[in-house]
Amino acid sequence: GTPIQNHLHELWALLNFLYPEVFTSSDVFDVSFNPKAGAHIGSELVTQLHLLLQRCLLRRLKMDVEKGLPPKTETKIFLPLSPMQAEWYRRVLMRDVSALGTGRAGGGTGSTSIQNIVMHLRKVCNHPYLFEGAEPGPPFIEGEHLIQNSGKLAVLDKLLRRLKEGGHRVLIFCTMTRMVDILQDYFEYRRYEYCRLDGTTSTTEREEMMREFNRPGSDKFLFVLSTRAGGLGINLFTADTVVLYDSDWNP
């Protein structure tokens, strides 16, 4: 999917690597398949690409390879903001209200400014403690406030309690490393056994944690991963539940 999303010339490069005797000229391919500058890929062009790829690639579905695997069950949970989240949401919007109307804030371009606002709103929805000054303290003391001040974490707390009672084992993915820090505080507050993997985890530590999590009789209930660090070379086959706490908008 990535070459088609980025630039179709990348697709030609892959096909040329696989079949150099067939895909000899990139110019012919570019003229035949690349849309005009700024134009969207239309349905006719997509159909032509599908016909081409069907002759070059073998697509094998899960149902063709392993019929014994149960179907994936995907659940989307919608929930309200906590009072603290609602307040911080309002603060973000009021601080940048001019940008929402004009497309500019702080002298930046319109699209960049709006993206920055959206990123702050995403942080509010994940947990208000991602903002400096939101967490009560000092002293900073773990407690129920960590859970109650985030609607998303409050639901996760109830979900994990039921999953643990049912003997399940869980993977949790986050895009923000700071959010992983907050989840780690929550795991320790609830006394859940867990493993953590992010961009600072060495290859040796990564292998050791995977072995420990997958070990028969392991007491590790949770494995929390940052999305980018956890996308390569990970094999956690003993988990049966995946939670996307903060899904990546551009996977």
Residue ranges and their predicted role:
Residues 46:
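Cys/His-rich Zn2+-binding cysteine-cluster or related metal-binding knuckle/ribbon modules and their
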